[in-house]
């Protein structure tokens, strides 16, 4: 978060979310602005209007986990595209944690933010080798 945020900046994250996001934000003095997804909607992304209400001058990014940890919900191409368009329109980063993209147990197809080149200037993809190669506990970063 330090590479895209200054102390006091904000990152919008749909909740429930991976608990360590709070720790990462706290370590960077960044404020997490939660936006609640609901079990009644199978944890789909809230409406764009709900995100728009959270954006202000301190907002620097929207962070998604796709598939979502802990809900397992896989965001659709439409959901990813809509939220990425909102980020682009507001000159925000769209940070997408795709660590679990190979762990989908339905017919739902995973759509990566990087599949659409128009978002490349705003997109940051988070990935890990620990899940894919069964290297749990390995703390290896790569760019």
Residue ranges and their predicted role:
Residues 1-10:
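Phosphate-binding glycine-rich loop
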Residues 3, 23-25, 86:
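Hydrophobic/aromatic ligand-binding patch that stacks against planar heteroaromatic rings
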Residues 9, 30, 89-93, 119-121:
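A short helix->loop->beta-strand "cap" motif at the edges of active sites that frequently abuts
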Residues 15, 34-39:
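Short beta->alpha connector loops at strand-helix junctions that form conserved
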Residues 26-33:
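A short helix-loop-beta submotif of the ANL/AMP-binding
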Residues 38-109:
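Active-site phosphate-binding strand-loop segment of PLP-dependent enzymes
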Residues 115-143:
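Active-site PLP attachment segment
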């Amino acid at each position: 978060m330090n590479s895209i945020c200054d102390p006091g900046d904000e990152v919008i994250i749909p909740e429930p979310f991976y608990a360590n996001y709070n720790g990462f934000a706290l370590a960077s003095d960044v404020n997490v602005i939660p936006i609640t997804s609901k079990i009644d909607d199978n944890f789909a992304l809230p409406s764009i209007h709900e995100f728009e209400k959270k954006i202000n001058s301190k907002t620097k990014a929207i962070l998604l986990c796709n598939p979502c940890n802990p809900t397992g919900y896989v965001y659709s191409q439409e959901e990813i595209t809509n939220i990425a368009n909102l980020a682009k329109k507001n000159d925000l980063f769209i940070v997408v944690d795709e660590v679990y993209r190979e762990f989908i147990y339905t017919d739902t197809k995973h759509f990566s933010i990087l599949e659409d080149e128009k978002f490349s200037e705003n997109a940051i993809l988070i990935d890990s080798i620990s899940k894919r190669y069964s290297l749990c506990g390995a703390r290896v970063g790569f760019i």
